[in-house]
Amino acid sequence: MIIYDSILKQKVEFKPIREYEANIYVCGPTVYDDAHLGHAKSSISFDLLRRTLKSLGYKVKFIKNFTDIDDKILKKMSQTGKSLEDITNHYISRYKADMYALNVADADIEPKATTSLTSIINYITTLFENGWAYKIDDGIYFDTSKDDKYLSLSGRKDENLIARVASKDEKKDEKDFVLWKFDENWYDSPFGRGRPGWHSECVAMIKDHFCGSCEFEIDIHAGGADLLFPHHENEAAQCRCAYNKNLAKYWMHNGFVQVNNEKMSKSLGNSFFIKDALELVPGEALRFYLMSSHYRANFNYDIDDLKSSKKRLDKIYRLKKRLIGVKTSKTDAKFKKDILDAMSDDLNISVALAILDEMVNNANAKLDNEPKNRDFKQILVSNLEFVKELLGILYIDEFKWFQWGVDDSLKQEISVLIDQRNMAKKDKNFILADQIRDKLTNMDISIMDTPNGTMWEKV
C-alpha cells in the first residue's frame, strides 16, 4: 500500500508498526450543528482508506472522536437554552444518520471529550508538572518555546501564523495554545474548574485506545487539510513533550470542499449541509460524487456535476439489475487485482473508477450477445460484490435505487396498479393487463416481471 505522507510531502510505502495491522485515528466533528460536505468528504476519504486496507488483508482499528464540549457548543447552549447533552447528543445522532446514508461505517471506537476527561486531565497534569505548560488567568497553556520541533509537522514559519492562532496578551508567545480553560460552570481538575481545550483532547484519546509500544503511538493520523495547522501541529507537540514519542508514523489529509472555488466553511457562510444534498440525490450518489476525485485534491461542489455523477452510478445499477437471481462465484482475478492496485496507490480513485466503467461497458456488450451465459453472469455478480465492499457503493436494491424521489402517494398508486395487473394476468385478462402496463408507461414507470414478483422503476 502506497500513501501520501503530508509531512514528508511525498508518497511512501505504508509500513505499519505491527505487520498487517493498521491503527488509524481520524479527527471527528465538533457537534454543534449539522454536518456539511467537508465532513462528508473527509469521512468518505478515510472510509475508503479503511476499506482498501481491509481488502488487502490488514486488521484495521479505526477510531473517530466527537468533540462534545467547545466554545461553539456553549454558544449554541446560550442561543437555544438547551443543555450540553441535549445539543451534542442531537447532533451526534444527526451526524451518524448522515454517515449511514453515505455508507460510511461507524468507527470501531467513537470517544467523546466529556467521557475522556480523566485521561485528558492526567495528560495535561503531566505536561504542567514537567514544565511544558504554564498557568495564566484564564487557563493552562502549552509553552511552544520549550518544544524545539514545534512547526516541524506543518512546516510553517512564524510570520505566517498570526491569522490561525488565538491572541492573548498574557501568553508567553502567540503560538502558545490553551490546554485547559478555567470556567466555574464545568469540571474539577487539579488546576481549577474548567474544561479541556480543543487541542488537548485527541492525544489523550489516542493514548487511551491505542497505547503504542514503540516510537509512534499510531500508524496513521488523518483529517481535513485545515487541521494540519494548528490542530495537528499542536497534538504532535504535546505528544512529543508528554511521552517523548511521535504521535503518528504517517499523517494523511484530504483536500477542501469548495463552493464557487472558495473554501466551504460555516464562518464564510457558504456551507452546504449533507442533509441538503440528500434532498437532491440518494446518499450513495452523494458518496460516489464526493469520492470521484482524489482525496487530496480540492473539490468544487456543483449541483449539475452531482446529478451527472448519479447517472454514472445509474449505469452500474442497471448492470446489477441485469443480474437479478444470479449467484456469486469467483471474482475475475484480473479485475480485482487491477482495481485494488489502483486503490493501493494512494487511493487512486480515478483509475479505479475507470476500470469499473470499462468492466461495466464490456459486461453489457457481452450480455447483449450472450444473455444466457450464466458463468459469466456469476463472475459479474462477484465483481460487483467486491466493488461494494471496496468502494462502499451498490448497497441498495437495484429496483429501489431507481425508485428514489418518487413520493409515497405515487408509490401507493403504482402498487395498486401492479396488483390489478397481476390479478388480470391470473384471470387471463391479458388485454386489461396490457392496458395497465401502458398506463404505467405513460406515468414514466417501467415494470419488469421477475422470479421475485413484479418490480418497477421510475424512467
Curated annotation (Swiss-Prot):
Query: Where does the motif 'KMSKS' region lie?
Result: 263-267
Q: Entry's Gene3D superfamilies?
A: Cysteine-tRNA ligase, C-terminal anti-codon recognition domain, HUPs
**So where does ATP get bound?**
266
One Pfam short name: DALR_2
The listed locations are:
Cytoplasm
- Under which main EC class is this enzyme filed? ligase
Q: CDD domains per the record?
A: CysRS_core
The superkingdom of the source organism is: Bacteria
Q: Which UniProt keywords apply?
A: Aminoacyl-tRNA synthetase, ATP-binding, Cytoplasm, Ligase, Metal-binding, Nucleotide-binding, Protein biosynthesis, Zinc
| Family matches, as InterPro entries | Cys-tRNA-ligase, Cys-tRNA-synt_Ia_DALR, Cys-tRNA/MSH_ligase, Rossmann-like_a/b/a_fold, tRNA-synt_1_cat_dom, tRNAsynth_Ia_anticodon-bd
Q: Which family does it belong to?
A: Belongs to the class-I aminoacyl-tRNA synthetase family.
Protein's name in the database: Cysteine--tRNA ligase
